[in-house]
From Swiss-Prot:
Major location (coarse): virion
Protein name, entry field: Major capsid protein
GO CC, any one term: T=16 icosahedral viral capsid
Keyword Ion transport in annotation: no
Gene (UniProt): MCP
Keyword annotations of the record: Capsid protein, Host nucleus, T=16 icosahedral capsid protein, Virion
Function statement: Self-assembles to form an icosahedral capsid with a T=16 symmetry, about 200 nm in diameter, and consisting of 150 hexons and 12 pentons (total of 162 capsomers). Hexons form the edges and faces of the capsid and are each composed of six MCP molecules. In contrast, one penton is found at each of the 12 vertices. Eleven of the pentons are MCP pentamers, while the last vertex is occupied by the portal complex.
Originating species: Epstein-Barr virus (strain AG876) (HHV-4)
HAMAP family referenced in this protein's UniProt entry, alphabetically: HSV_MCP
């Protein structure tokens, strides 16, 4: 204590204060200061500065660090003065541990006593402060004041110097507190780790991979359930106090109460003298909440030492040992205790000198501190935040944490036949049961809808539409799979034009029946498709927009290639089932205001007609003779009317319903009561339905123009002029070459017609009968004598532009007819020469002895024509047959096939292989599409017609088998070929990987229930998977065909609690060292260095930390989506006008501004200007992962990897990168989290998949995503493996320290926080490779019900779902006066 006598008598009076050692050091320090003034002599400022160092040294020697002793933080320390600290170099202290044993009475051999020497590392800490003293003040101190003014200056100088010195001392005091707190944090693992690993239930089983898996599960459970427990308690209602006590008690129980200083208890409660078991270091807000929840003891003081003990090193080595819980300072002390007096009981009084000399003589004073009672423990609670706030320094217990959230958009529930809600009265209209948006709540309780419009900046970017990176990844991998496709990869050009020979040669003695991957996928349900046993197919399902296959390059090496799927309908059936396509069709109906013209009766009539085995074969003869010529139809109106009326009256079915041209002519020319009114009404409805569908498609596409082309061809394949109808009677090929800019090629046999200048070489124009009268003889001669097999000219009528008639025809053949008939049809080739002979070469047709009105059957001899008429149950007149025979005058000789190849549109031609940028189709020239034949019909017509299976919709094997015996034999040998999607068609006519329509569409057509919904569904299946299509569908809220997983990372400001048990750290305080840093003319600067050291004295982890409350959420938790046009500005489609249109529509390009900074071509990333203002905080960036619509909704209801497959492999045995990569990427192994499947999203979880190439930085040649990428941590392979390795090492390291008795483990193990723990605490999602479900619902009604404060709510309402938020942060949701926690 300083005495008043120590102050010199001066003329100016001085104020003296009480010397309180624990609260004020100024007076004791000033005593040395004032006595040292005599040492300063002379007037030279520099000399004075040198001499003042002596004064400063005397002053700093008086530093006692009493402020630290006043803090409750000192409860967890044994504080000792160690003047020889600077001489300590070894930095290790040894402790002796005896392991207790259990005596058994079952005859087991007694255990020997085991004693271990545990080494504790001593860590040095250096703190320093700087003090600057003015030379003018020092000179004034040297002067002798004589006047009152000089006295005042003298006193002011003394105060200034003393204040500067006190400033430095205060900084050192704070530095000690900060050092101790840092030491505590270094030894304080997170609560969710420590609580799990400290549980003997786990640790006593060892640490096999099974146990590690359990540990990770417990990590996640504790993280979710116990983080931010004060926020949970606020809204818990009754029981909150017990809940908070329980959480705090768990913290106390999780740490080790064992210490090598067992007998030391330097802090006790003022009332009762109960030892203080530890201290909670908290923030101010947490302190207020704790005291509000729990209250504090009546006596809010604790008793503690008023000074430091003294630590003296004696002997060559310092050995501190623990024996039977007693502390010993030296081996001599150990020998005296154990050998000389082994039965003498030790006490605190006798043990303390072993640690520090003079402890028993330390005075004890009361210290103000909050104390709470947890069970039988009294624990101090203190906040040190004010000290950090005063110094404008960050408080170590305030942390920034990042949590990743995810939610799905657009998932399809296959059988939404029920609801769990009794409150929602949503219209149960099926059109509303396919979700197209997700409703979420931002941090300010604003309800937001994330829909397709928000995702356009990702979905419309070229990176999503290119397979180049995917193919590079596959080709860089080891050898491709063993099974390689050989069938249907490429079209094979025939060297002749005889289609009958092509079909005969293909099916004759054909035994092999390969099935394409596309077809194999169609036959699998979603569960089987995603099963590990299906890895052979799954491994190439990497991109939603591309079918990937293995081809061969010029060197005959196997190379992966990709062809665009073009339309939504070509998505694999397991990932886009039929029910989903129909739901899209219903959305299409609603969005485009489609009012169907046909009714179910018309559809059923068409279906009955298609499956009528007695369908009159003579109708095909009539249709062949007319073959799309309106003039010939008018010539044969009586016969056509007879056919329609007879078939309608006899069977109630529609004739010629298989031909668009016939229906069109019937509607145009037979409306004058020539046929039955009911039948005509049905034809009109069919034609009206085509018009309605065409208008709906036009409303979907809009009226925009891109360049000189309508945007419709980019939106829907039916509006694309490059897709031709499957049957041609007029010269649509030359018209295509004229209007298309996509390099069309008309492949006729082995010739290519690609230039309209070559039209005379390939097209033989056939005009009206009057025009062709002069050529009848030449035509006859050609039919009889021509080399038809090698004549590559096509006999076609002139193309007639009738507005949108081409679109109507395509809708008929690609939508209406296959849907209503279940694609139960096949192409039909016609031998016109034999048909003409059948019709004309008979008596009534030639002879003038028969009048036109006579019934031809009454005068017809036995023959093919009679058989045809009889099985068709027709009785035409002689005149009708004559007119029909006359129609043959301009008929071709045979049906031919033409292969049409065109470039994909510019948004779909990003495949690297030129051949894969084109799409092909086969067009039947002067042929028909027909229904199945009966046995009787085939016997009669086998010389007239032959099967041509040329298209997915017009190649039903069951129908073809009724027309061709070789096909029937082939199908019988290979029963699996009965499926439309699997049926092998001649490669000269069909190559599935090049077709517009592929197996999924064929399977849908074959299996759908003919209905209005199916028609709408098939129409919607023709919508393209292109940026323009996504833009159009976003505008009308139509599902794009794929779902999305939205990933967002939010930042949380958390306030944490640190608990440290008593005497868990020994702090050694050395002596200060003063040095002059700088001496100037006007001032002198000194640095005071102080050396300290710390030793962790716990026998395990004696401190822990856990998040207590959320101070703030800094991000908005909104729907701001990553702009890929800013992230990857250098990538573009091949047409600048298309690029500009897309950017303008998605909002990535502002009109009237500089379109592109030239520097971005080098840097790879544009400067993104933020919003001018923010209302909800920093915008959290959302990123999109394209996901199959069949993804399991339950997957998103708990924390999982957004990739779709678990990526946390800490549970594996000896960690190595190969094993880790196998568990993460090898889909032949089950998902570790869901062993019944490999993945929930093959488009994101596999190496080289779309999600992988979008967010794995190894594929980014130019830049990483914008300012922040929430998906990068889940996809970047290097970062993912690094986090896995870090978590694996972390669990192993903690397990080493906590897996058994400390003494039996490595004696060099130190109980410190393992590297990476801070990252684990602040970014747990990166380590666990999981994102937390965010509150979202596919319908706002479900959110409203969730907010209705009911005990239960509706997780499912038909096709809609709600996903509750399961995250460490428990938000309070408030809409109006409704509150949900």
């Amino acid at each position: 204590m300083a005495s008043n006598e120590g102050v010199e008598n001066r003329p100016f009076p001085y104020l003296t204060v009480d010397a309180d050692l624990l609260s004020n050091l100024r007076q004791s320090a000033a005593e040395g200061l004032f006595h040292s003034f005599d040492l300063l002599v002379g007037k030279d400022a520099r000399e004075a500065g040198i001499k003042f160092e002596v004064l400063l040294g005397v002053y700093t020697n008086a530093i006692q660090y009493v402020r630290f002793l006043e803090t409750a933080l000192a409860v967890s320390c044994v504080n000792t003065e160690f003047k020889d600290l600077s001489r300590m170099t070894d930095g290790k202290i040894q402790f002796r541990i005896s392991v207790p044993t259990i005596a058994h009475g079952d005859g087991r051999r007694p255990s020997k006593q085991r004693t271990f020497i545990v080494v504790k590392n001593c860590h040095k800490h250096h703190i320093s402060t700087e003090m600057e003293l003015s030379m003018l003040d020092l000179e004034i101190l040297h002067s002798i004041p004589e006047t009152p003014v000089e006295y005042a200056e003298y006193v002011g100088a003394v105060k200034t110097v003393a204040s500067a010195l006190q400033f430095g001392v205060d900084a050192l005091e704070r530095g000690l507190i900060n050092t101790v707190l840092s030491v505590k944090l270094r030894h304080a693992p997170p609560m969710f780790i420590l609580q799990t690993l400290a549980d003997p239930t786990f640790t006593e089983r060892g640490f096999s991979k099974t146990v590690k898996s359990d540990l990770i599960a417990m990590f996640k459970r504790h993280l979710l359930e116990h983080s931010f427990f004060l926020d949970r308690a606020e809204n818990m209602g009754s029981g909150f106090s017990q809940y908070v006590r329980s959480r705090l008690s768990e913290m106390v129980a999780a740490v080790s109460g064992e210490s090598v200083l067992k007998g030391v208890s330097t802090y006790t409660t003022a009332k009762g003298g109960e030892p203080v078991g530890g201290v909670f270091i908290v923030t101010d807000n947490v302190l207020r909440q704790l005291l509000t929840f729990l209250g504090e003891e009546a006596d809010n003081q604790i008793m503690g030492p008023s000074s430091y003990a003294s630590f003296v090193v004696r002997g060559e080595n310092l050995v501190t040992a623990v024996s039977y819980g007693r502390v010993m300072r030296t081996f001599e002390h150990f020998m005296a205790r154990i050998v000389d007096s082994p039965e003498k009981a030790g006490s605190t009084k006798s043990d303390l000198p072993a640690v520090a000399a003079g402890v028993e003589d330390q005075p004890r004073v009361p210290i103000s501190a909050a104390v709470i009672k947890l069970g039988n423990h009294a624990v101090a609670v203190e906040s040190l935040q004010k000290m950090y706030n005063d110094t404008q320094s960050p408080y170590p217990l305030n942390r920034r944490m990042q949590y990743s959230y995810y939610f799905p958009v657009g998932l399809f529930m296959p059988n939404p036949k029920y609801t769990t809600s009794a409150a929602i009265k949503m219209l149960d209209n099926p059109t509303q049961q396919l979700p197209v948006e997700a409703w979420i709540v931002n941090k300010n309780n604003l309800l937001l809808a994330f829909n397709l419009q928000n995702a356009l900046k990702v979905l419309c970017h070229p990176r999503l539409h290119t397979p180049a990176h995917t193919l590079n990844s596959l080709n860089a991998a080891p050898a491709p799979r063993d099974r390689r496709e050989t069938y249907s990869l490429q079209h094979r050009r025939p060297n002749h034009m005889n289609v009958l020979v092509i079909v005969d040669e293909f099916y004759d003695n054909k035994y092999a029946a390969p099935v394409t991957d596309i077809a194999l996928k169609c036959g699998l349900p979603t569960e089987d498709f995603l099963h590990p046993s299906n890895y052979d197919l799954l491994r190439l399902e990497l991109h939603p927009l591309y079918d990937i296959y293995i081809g061969r390059d010029a060197g005959e090496r196997a190379r992966h290639r990709a062809v665009h799927r073009l339309m939504v309908g070509n998505l694999p059936t397991p990932l886009a089932p039929a029910a989903f396509q129909e739901a899209r069709g219903q959305q299409f109906e609603t969005a485009t205001s489609l009012a169907h013209v046909v009714d179910q009766a018309v559809i059923e009539t068409v279906q009955d007609t298609a499956y009528d085995t007695a369908y009159p074969a003579f109708f095909y003869v009539v249709e062949a003779m007319i073959h799309g010529f309106e003039e010939k139809f008018v010539m044969n109106v009586p016969l056509v009317s007879l056919c329609i009326n007879t078939y309608w009256e006899r069977a109630g079915r529609l004739a010629f319903v298989n031909s668009f041209s016939m229906i069109k002519f019937i509607c145009r020319h037979l409306g004058n009561n020539a046929i039955s009114k009911e039948a005509y009404s049905m034809y009109r409805k069919i034609y009206g339905e085509l018009i309605a569908l065409e208008q709906a498609l036009m409303r979907l596409a809009g009226s925009d123009v891109v360049g000189d082309e309508s945007v419709g061809q980019y939106v829907c394949a039916l509006l694309d002029p490059n897709l031709l109808p499957p049957v041609a009677y007029t010269d649509i090929f030359t018209h295509l070459l004229t209007v298309s800019d996509r390099a069309p090629q008309i492949i006729i046999g082995n010739e290519v017609y690609a230039d309209t200048l070559a039209a005379p070489q390939f097209i033989e124009r056939v005009g009206n009968m009057d025009e062709m009268a002069a050529q009848f003889v030449a035509l006859y001669g050609y039919r009889v004598n021509g080399d038809h097999d090698h004549d590559f000219r096509l006999h076609l009528g002139p193309y007639v532009d009738e507005g949108h008639a081409d679109v109507l025809e395509k809708i008929f053949y690609y939508v209406f007819l296959p849907t209503c008939t279940n694609a139960h049809m096949c192409g039909l080739g016609v031998d016109f020469q034999h048909v003409a002979q059948t019709l004309a070469y008979n008596g009534p047709a030639f002879s003038h002895h028969f009048t036109r009105d006579e019934d031809i059957l009454d005068n017809l001899e036995n023959g093919t024509l009679r058989d045809l008429l009889e099985i068709s149950d027709l009785r035409p007149t002689v005149g009708m047959i004559r007119d029909l025979s006359a129609s043959f005058m301009t008929c071709p000789t045979f049906t031919r096939t033409v292969r049409v190849s065109v470039d994909n549109d510019v948004t779909q031609q990003l495949a690297p292989n030129p051949a894969d940028k084109r799409t092909e189709q086969t067009v039947l020239v002067n042929g028909l599409v027909a229904f199945a034949f009966s046995e009787r019909t085939r016997a009669v017509t086998q010389c007239l017609f032959h099967a041509i299976p040329f298209h997915m919709f017009y190649g039903d094997p069951r129908v073809a088998a009724t027309m061709h015996q070789d096909v029937a034999t082939f199908v019988m040998r290979n029963p699996q070929q009965r499926a439309v999607e699997a049926f092998n068609r001649p490669e000269q006519l069909f190559a599935e990987y090049r077709e517009w329509h592929r197996s999924p569409m064929g399977k849908y057509a074959a299996e759908c229930l003919p209905s209005l919904v199916s028609i709408s569904g098939m129409t919607a299946m023709h919508i393209k998977m292109s940026p323009m299509a996504y833009i159009a569908q976003a505008k009308l809220k139509i599902h794009p065909g794929v779902a999305m997983t939205v990933v967002r990372t939010d930042e949380i400001l958390s306030e944490n609690i640190l608990f440290s048990s008593r005497a868990s750290t020994s702090m050694f305080i050395g002596t200060p060292n003063v040095s002059r840093r700088e001496a100037r003319v006007d001032a002198v600067t000194f640095e005071v260095h102080h050396e300290m050291a710390s030793i962790d004295t716990g026998l395990s982890y004696s401190s822990t930390m856990t998040p207590a409350r959320v101070a703030a959420i800094t991000t908005d938790m909104g729907i701001h989506t990553q702009d890929f046009f800013s992230v990857f500005p250098a990538e573009a489609f091949g047409n600048q006008q298309v690029n500009d249109y897309i950017k303008a529509k998605v909002g990535a390009q502002r009109n009237g501004t500089l379109l592109r900074d030239p520097r971005t071509y080098l840097a790879g990333m544009t400067n993104v200007n933020g919003a001018p203002g923010l209302c909800h905080g920093q915008q959290a960036t959302c990123e999109i992962i394209v996901t199959p619509v069949t993804a399991d909704v339950a997957y998103f209801q708990k924390s999982n990897s957004p990739r779709g497959r678990a990526a946390c492999v800490v549970s594996c045995e000896n960690y190595n990168q190969e094993v880790a990569e196998g568990l993460i990427y090898d889909h032949s192994r089950p998902d570790a989290a869901y062993e019944y499947r490999s993945t929930v999203n093959p488009w994101a979880s596999q190496l080289g998949s779309l999600g992988d190439i979008m967010y794995n930085s190894s594929y980014r040649q130019t830049a990483v995503p914008g300012l922040y990428s929430p998906c990068r941590a889940f996809f970047n392979k290097e970062e993912l493996l690094r986090n896995n390795r870090g978590l694996y090492n972390m669990v192993n390291e903690y397990s080493q320290r906590l897996g058994g008795h400390p003494a039996t483990s490595n004696t060099e193990v130190q109980f410190v926080v393992i590297a990476g723990t801070d990252v684990f605490l602040e970014q747990p999602c990166s380590f666990l490779q999981e994102a937390f479900p965010a509150l979202s619902a596919s319908s706002r009604a479900l959110i409203d019900e969730f907010m209705s404060v009911k005990q239960t709510h509706a997780p499912i309402h038909y096709g809609h779902y709600i996903i509750e938020e399961v995250a460490p942060v428990r938000r309070i949701l408030k809409f109006g006066n409704k509150v949900v926690f």
